[in-house]
């Protein structure tokens, strides 16, 4: 099986459509379907900050749950939106407010449909995907070699948030260790979460979050070819979001 792994979309539907077309997908049925049966895999954070979060929920639900032709691993923004839809007390900030505004503008029957689709998508998707006979791991923020195969709370925190130290940057965002430098495994770990200006290859890991929602690019990784394909963002560039990893 061949995969096209897509970085953090954050509601950037136009960039997602542009990227999938560049990757050879047809949109004849309003969904990206590849003529050679390649499958899309999403590293999470499909919503928040960008203009079309609900459209992305509907597309990813259709591909993953209904047609079963794609893979999705949830990100930290996905986790927060899931908790919002469950009625938990979450702070509506850091991008969630854009998704909530879209959601609240809908009639109640459409709200219920979006809520049900996202809850189903989240609950039926694993924390990370182990593909190609364990040669490929797709997850949101990365995973340590000794965590592969585990699903406990410590692993959940790692794959959603990265290797956080407990400290904070001046803007309140968490300080993260550079776990990829310590990775010694042979499985390819393809992830996102931390915006980088260019895809970052370290050992057998690749960070493909190139900050589409911050004016960078939306990036896909063609596997097993290990070929990078990107499209430019239509949004303003926000340089402070591309912080070096500690």
Curated annotation (Swiss-Prot):
Function as written in the Swiss-Prot or TrEMBL entry: Asymmetrically hydrolyzes Ap4p to yield AMP and ATP.
**Assigned GO CC terms:** cytoplasm
| Source species, domain of life | Bacteria
Q: Which GO terms describe its molecular function?
A: bis(5'-nucleosyl)-tetraphosphatase (asymmetrical) activity; GTP binding; nickel cation binding; phosphatase activity
What is the protein named? Bis(5'-nucleosyl)-tetraphosphatase PrpE [asymmetrical]
What keywords does the record list, in alphabetical order?
GTP-binding, Hydrolase, Nickel, Nucleotide-binding
Q: Which reaction does it catalyse?
A: P(1),P(4)-bis(5'-guanosyl) tetraphosphate + H2O = GMP + GTP + 2 H(+)
Indicate whether Coiled coil appears among the record's keywords: no
Q: Which family does it belong to?
A: Belongs to the PrpE family.
The cofactor named in the record is:
Ni(2+)
Q: What class of enzyme is it?
A: hydrolase
Task: Tell me the InterPro entries matching this sequence.
Answer: Ap4A_hydrolase, Bis(5'-nucleosyl)-tetraP_PrpE, Calcineurin-like_PHP_ApaH, Metallo-depent_PP-like, MPP_PrpE-like
EC number(s) given by UniProt: 3.6.1.17
